[in-house]
């Protein structure tokens, strides 16, 4: 079972502290500190803290504004299916990590990837990453930068005339350099969109099947219904069918099977 999360500037701090088990007073009472040594990381080893690397990566990409509600980081939580034999655990999480890296731009966008084994229930992977999309730099900025590289002594009047753009635009970009031309941008909206969410479980299942890892993370429910139904929605549907009678035994049985799959961490 997998679920997606998005984190604004303030939520990033608590999330990274949580996954690294550095929160002094964690809200999650299910954490057994005596088992925390069993947790492990799949993220690349770096000489930077997670916060330092996040800042470094954000400096490399275009960010439209600094609003408080912008999502600076996204994340997936993937839980090991109950029926998966323990000997496949590390291979399963490594495969999930590789799948996520391939899907979201590679290791350079990974902030953390921690497998937790110190909570109740099955082990699970917290995969946190910067949602990076393709960016098309401002055309006039590129023009000004390239022109001034070739004509460093040109004044604003000359640049305006030869480039065919306004004097205001030349002044705006005059002090920019190649570092300001960014072909990547921060955009959780573009990366974690409806199509991505709807295809996620099925794509992950195909990847695991290709590696012959006997884990079920997709049952076809998403495809059949156009989106995952919550446990509460399924229970309400089942109870409605039972209450109103009719030949609904098979339908109720099907819904019960789906609920069992939720309980087992399959979907």
Where in the sequence are the language-model features?
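N-terminal nicking endonuclease/strand-transfer module with a His-rich metal-binding environment
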Residues: 1-150, 154, 158-168, 172-267
């Amino acid at each position: 079972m997998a679920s997606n999360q998005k984190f604004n500037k303030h939520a990033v701090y608590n999330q990274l502290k949580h996954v690294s088990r550095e929160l002094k007073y964690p809200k999650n009472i299910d954490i057994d500190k005596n088992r925390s040594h069993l947790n492990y990381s799949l993220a690349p080893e770096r000489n930077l803290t997670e916060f330092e690397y996040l800042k470094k990566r954000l400096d490399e990409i275009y960010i439209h504004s600094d609003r408080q509600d912008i999502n600076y980081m996204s994340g997936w939580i993937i839980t090991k299916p109950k029926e998966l034999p323990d000997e496949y655990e590390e291979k399963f999480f490594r495969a999930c990590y590789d799948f996520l890296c391939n899907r979201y731009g590679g290791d350079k966008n990974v902030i953390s990837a921690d497998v937790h084994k110190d909570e109740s229930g099955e082990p699970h992977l917290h995969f946190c990453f910067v949602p990076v999309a393709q960016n098309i730099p401002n055309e006039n900025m590129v023009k000004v930068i390239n022109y001034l590289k070739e004509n460093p002594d040109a004044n604003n009047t000359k640049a305006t005339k030869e480039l065919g753009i306004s004097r205001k635009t030349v002044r705006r970009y005059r002090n920019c350099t190649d570092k300001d031309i960014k072909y990547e941008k921060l955009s959780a909206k573009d990366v974690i969109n409806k199509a991505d969410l709807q295809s996620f479980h099925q794509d992950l299942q195909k990847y695991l099947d290709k590696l012959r890892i006997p884990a079920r993370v997709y049952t076809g429910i998403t495809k059949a219904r156009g989106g995952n139904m919550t446990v509460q929605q399924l229970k309400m549907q089942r109870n409605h069918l039972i209450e109103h009678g009719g030949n609904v035994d098979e339908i109720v049985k099907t819904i019960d099977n789906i609920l069992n799959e939720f309980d087992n961490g399959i979907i």
